Amino acid sequence: MFKLPELGYDYDAVEPYIDAKTMEIHHSKHHNGFVMNLNSILEKMGKIHLTDVSNILKNIHDFPEEFQTLIRNNAGGYSNHTLYFRTLRPGNKDNLFEKFKDDINAAFGSLDVLKANLKDTAMKIFGSGWAWLVLCPESGLKVISMPNQDSPLMNSYKPILGIDVWEHAYYLKYQNRRIEYVDAFLKALNWEEVSKVYNEVIN
């Protein structure tokens, strides 16, 4: 059975970039909704004992076909948001670990180029979805987009950071100004925490 992960910080901790009300609704309503729905689906399948969301998403086609879309949406939503909120955790956000920095420079040229790629990808998403920095087994670090709540894990990519461009992530503060939200998210992003995610993925 899955549980809503604790944020580990207050809802207003990401101000002024993302407002407290948005953070509260996003975490306690949307993220929690994916948790509750995922548990309900697993219970219906007699799989409530499953607790590794990565394995669920990687092996989604092993589940009955009538449940696969529900699993994709809700296991994806759970996994995506868990990483999203983790990487917004306050801290030494400009502390990019040396190995991660070297690999970013090798793949993109610089951190600024990576940020520009993420922003461009986020802005090109039509409707709802996510812009991702992922580690691809064949080609290393790359920026991709995924629609809706689809997880990079379904494609054997390892997610490092994700920008949620569903309107629920920003509409209270930014309305239709997605570009301002994306800029704000990149300013709020804790690169030390993202570096820790990267270390976990490569080790």
Swiss-Prot record:
Assigned GO CC terms: cytosol
InterPro entries xrefs: Mn/Fe_SOD, Mn/Fe_SOD_BS, Mn/Fe_SOD_C, Mn/Fe_SOD_N, Mn/Fe_SOD_N_sf, SOD_C_sf
Co-factor remark: Binds 1 Fe cation per subunit.
Catalytically driven reaction(s): 2 superoxide + 2 H(+) = H2O2 + O2
Keywords, sorted A to Z: Iron, Metal-binding, Oxidoreductase
Induction of the gene: No inducing conditions were found; seems to be constitutively expressed (at protein level). Part of the secA-sod operon. Expression is partially under translational control of BpuR; increased levels of BpuR lead to decreased expression of SodA (at protein level).
Residues at which Fe cation binds: H26, H81, D164, H168
Pfam families, per the entry: Sod_Fe_C, Sod_Fe_N
Protein EC: 1.15.1.1
Family: Belongs to the iron/manganese superoxide dismutase family.
Quaternary structure (record): Homotetramer.
PANTHER family: 37S RIBOSOMAL PROTEIN S26, MITOCHONDRIAL, SMALL RIBOSOMAL SUBUNIT PROTEIN MS42
The protein, known as: Superoxide dismutase [Fe]
Originating gene: sod
